[in-house]
Amino acid sequence: MKIIGKWALLIIAALSLPVKAALDIVITEGVDAARPIAVVPFVWQGTGPVPSQISDVVASDLTRSGTFKPLDALGLPQSGISTLAEFAPQKWTGINAEAAVVGAIKPYGPDQYLVTFDLIDLLKAQLAGQAPLNKQDLLLDSRQTVITAAQFRQYGHRISDVVYEKLTGIRGAFLTRIAYVVVNHAEKAPYRLMIADYDGYNEHMLLRSPEPLMSPAWSPDGRRLAYVSFENRKAEIFVQDIFTQARTKVSSFPGINGAPSFSPDGKTLAVTLSKDGQSEIYTIDIATKTTRRITNHYAIDTEPSWFPDGKSLLITSERGGRPQLYKVELDSGKLTRLTFDGEWNLGGSITPDGRTLIFVNRTNGKFNIARMDLETRFMQVLTTTRLDESPSVAPNGTMVIYGTTHQGRQVLAAVSTDGRFKARLPAGQGEVKSPSWSPFL
C-alpha cells in the first residue's frame, strides 16, 4: 500500500476558506456516454458522524471529468466494504462498470484521520467468470495517508487524480485551481480577482478594485498570477504572489499594456504593448523589466501565448485583414499563419503536449471555442454556447474553461477537448469572466 505525502495538499490548504462552492457546476451534456465506474461510500470507522464523505468528492470529480459516470451508490451490490479483501467478485457479476473505488476513514489522532482506499478492476473480475481468481490480481492501486479535517476535500481530489490516471493513462487535474474575475456593479469596488479550486470550492479573493481587472495568467509553478489592472486609471500589468500577496508592477507604458502570458520557465512575460505606436507583441524580463519587441507591423498584433518549448509564441494578428492565429519563432522572427477556416480565429493557446491549438472561432457571426490538430490542421468546433471567449486549457489537456454568455449574464463554462462533455459554472452573484486554469500543483 502506497503512502501519499502531504506536500501536494499544502499549496491548496494554504489558500482554503470555509468549504463552499462559489461557482456551481451545471453539467449540460456528455454524461450518458461516459465510462461507468463504481464509487462505494467510504466506511467511517469512528464514533459520531463522519467528518466528511470523501467518496462524494471523488464521484463528483469523475463525473465532471466527462470521462466517467459513477453508478448510483444505492444500487451497488456491496456497500460497507473498504478493502479488496472484503470485495466479493461474484456479487458484481453483470454490473456494467470497469472499476470500483472502496475505502475507509478512521480517527488517527487529534484532528487527524487515516484515509485508505483501493481501486479494484471490475472488468478483469467479470472476464474471469467462474474461473479461479487471485483477488490480488484485481488491485489496480492501494494507498493510505493521514490528513487533517481541513484536508478532506483536497485529498478527495488527490484520490480522483490517482483513479483517473490509472484508468486513462492521463494525469488527473482535479488538484488544480482556476483564477477568474467577478464583476458585481452593485458593489462600490465591483471588480474582484478570485482564485478557487477547479470545481469552484475554496474561493479566495486576491484583489478587489473599483476599476477593471482582466487577463489573469498563472506562472508555471502556480505561485504567481500576472494580470491587467486599471486601478490607476490606465492599463498596467502586475505580477502577484498568491501566498504572500506581494506584487510587482511589471509594465506601465503609455497606451496598451495587456494580455500577459508567462514563459514556461516563469522568467519572462509575453505581453501586448502599444508604447511605440501600434499594438505589438513584446517580451518582458520579470526581474530586470527589460523589454524585447517581437513583432513589427502596422496591423494589430495581440494575445500572445507560449508554445510549450518556450521557443515560439502563438499570437492573434490582423495582418491578413482579419484576426487569425500565427506562430512566431523568437530567435528568427519567422511568422507562420496557422488558421484559415471561418471568419475570425483568435485568443489561442497550445495544449501542454504541443499538439493541439485551442482558440475562439467566429463563423457566420457566432463565436465558439474550437480546436485544431497542428499536424493535420483538422479543425473542430467544440461549443454551441454564445459569445465564447478567453479559453484556458487544463494542465492535462483534456478540458477547456472559457467565458461565455448565458441568459444575458457572463458566466464560465467548460468543455472537453473532444467536445463531448459540456458544463456551465455560473456564479451566485455578479458575472464571471477571464478564466485561467492553473498548472499542476
Curated annotation (Swiss-Prot):
Localization of this protein: Periplasm
Q: Which family does it belong to?
A: Belongs to the TolB family.
Q: Which InterPro entries match?
A: 6-blade_b-propeller_TolB-like, PD40, Tol-Pal_TolB, TolB_N
UniProt key word Ribosomal protein: no
Q: Which function does this protein serve?
A: Part of the Tol-Pal system, which plays a role in outer membrane invagination during cell division and is important for maintaining outer membrane integrity.
Known SUPFAM superfamilies for this protein?
A: TolB, N-terminal domain, Tricorn protease N-terminal domain
What is one process in the GO biological process aspect for this record?
A: protein import
Q: Which residues cross the membrane?
A: none
Provide the species name: Shewanella amazonensis (strain ATCC BAA-1098 / SB2B)
GO CC terms on record? periplasmic space
Q: Which UniProt keywords apply?
A: Cell cycle, Cell division, Periplasm, Signal
Q: Name one Pfam family in it.
A: PD40
Subunit record text? The Tol-Pal system is composed of five core proteins: the inner membrane proteins TolA, TolQ and TolR, the periplasmic protein TolB and the outer membrane protein Pal. They form a network linking the inner and outer membranes and the peptidoglycan layer.
Protein name, as recorded: Tol-Pal system protein TolB
Q: Which HAMAP family match?
A: TolB
- UniProt signal peptide: 1-21
